[in-house]
Amino acid sequence: MEESIGRFLGEVIARRMVEKFGNDIEGLKNSLDYLFSWERDFKLEVEGNTVISSGLCPIKRFYPRYCEKGCLAFAEKFAEQFKAKVERVSIDPCTFKFTLE
């Protein structure tokens, strides 16, 4: 169930972000910044065609099952809208690496 929710939200939100910021590397960076800047210690790094987002997300603490399954599903569907691949680098801090193809 968490994966289904994550995929649904990832696709819907990413479509809106593409409309707002575009689907290039800068659009991906701006979208992630717009969506997750509320996370404690949030930071973004851009290296070539890769964006690494990292922060201390409270979802792991309050809903660990969603963190494990739903967050990755969200990130995968989100990345698709930017024609990117994503991998989870770590859970604490929550770190994802997006690479545009």
Where in the sequence are the language-model features?
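N-terminal accessory segment detector
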Residues: 1-50, 54-76, 82-91, 95-101
